Amino acid sequence: MATDLEFMEFVAEQIENAGIITFRKMFGEYALYSNGKVVALVCDNKLFVKPTIKGREFIGIITEGFAYPGAKPSFLIEEKLEDREWLSELIRITEKALPEPKPKKKRKKKN
């Protein structure tokens, strides 16, 4: 089941105070960006946050899940989805802990 745009917009609104929040549709699901870094995936109307040590410490008792078959485990956020302040802080922590995205290589022109 693909994620509804309405759910994706709800998640983005919940974390709007975490930084510059954007999302991009990919294969019927969404990648969630904070300040240019992919911090989470939204699949099947569920939020999967990239795991980090600091994020694990912040959450405490975690629930892990897989965003799609073959994916690495992520933090599955369900109960705290309504808590804007808590969720925004988790996204800030995650974004700070992740490395900067690699610059895209320029394509060579065909002659």
Question: Which residue stretches match the model-derived regions?
Answer:
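Charge-dense, helix-prone N-terminal extensions
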Residues: 1-111
